[in-house]
Design a protein with these regions (language model features):
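ATP-binding Walker
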Residues: 14
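Conserved phosphate-donor/acceptor-positioning beta-strand/loop module used by diverse small-molecule
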Residues: 97-117
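P-loop (Walker A) phosphate-binding loop of NTP-binding proteins
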Residues: 11
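Conserved substrate/cofactor phosphate-moiety recognition/catalytic segment
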Residues: 21-68
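Loop/turn-to-beta-strand initiation segments
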Residues: 78-83
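Small-molecule kinase domains that catalyze NTP-dependent phosphoryl transfer to phosphate-bearing small molecules
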Residues: 91, 119-162
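Hydrophobic anchor at the beta1->P-loop junction of P-loop NTPases
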Residues: 8
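Walker A/P-loop
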Residues: 17
Length: 166
């Protein structure tokens, strides 16, 4: 999709979708990876697995992106810059395709407040919320070596900070 491609990652509630929407509103090419590319699969092989919606840890551990579809999008250089927003557990298969990876960093109070503001979505269920809090503390699913962006700031400042590094 872009001559240069950027991945914006973060834990649930860190602001990925809000950042993506603001980038779109500013005229940038954006792929909502969790909407377009995500499915439940084995993070090593990509083989689809039977979803287990009642098991948040399983859902999280098997939330992966379609690597072949992602590669097609990255190879299409129609736009000067494309931003891919979302999270996946098979990032290790494609992280090297991005010019930079940004990590939206925020505190638990901010994440919790944001999750409260999106009823019916991931993180609304108490078991999901508990898992998100554990992941926030452990940082186990976060990309190592990513460019940290303080996502507690106003949204336009977060987006400006990302664009300043592109």
């Amino acid at each position: 999709m872009g001559e240069r491609n950027f991945l914006i990652e973060g834990i649930s509630g860190s602001g990925k979708t809000s950042v993506a929407t603001m980038l779109e509103n500013r005229g940038f090419d954006v792929i909502h990876g969790d909407r377009l590319l995500a499915y439940q699969g084995d993070p090593q092989t990509g083989v689809p697995v039977m979803p287990r919606p009642q098991d948040p840890a399983f859902v999280n551990a098997h939330h992966i992106w379609d690597v072949d579809q992602l590669k097609r999008l990255i190879d299409d250089q129609t736009h000067p810059r494309t931003f891919f927003c979302g999270a996946s557990r098979n990032r290790h298969h494609f992280a090297q395709w991005f010019d930079a990876i940004f990590l939206l960093e925020t505190d638990w109070a901010t994440i919790s407040r944001r999750l409260d503001g999106r009823p019916g979505e991931w993180g609304d269920d108490p078991r999901e919320r508990s898992l998100i809090q554990q992941l926030h503390i452990s940082r186990i699913d976060l990309p190592i070596g990513a460019i940290a962006i303080d996502a507690t700031r106003p949204l336009h400042e977060v987006v400006d900070a990302i664009l300043a590094r592109c």
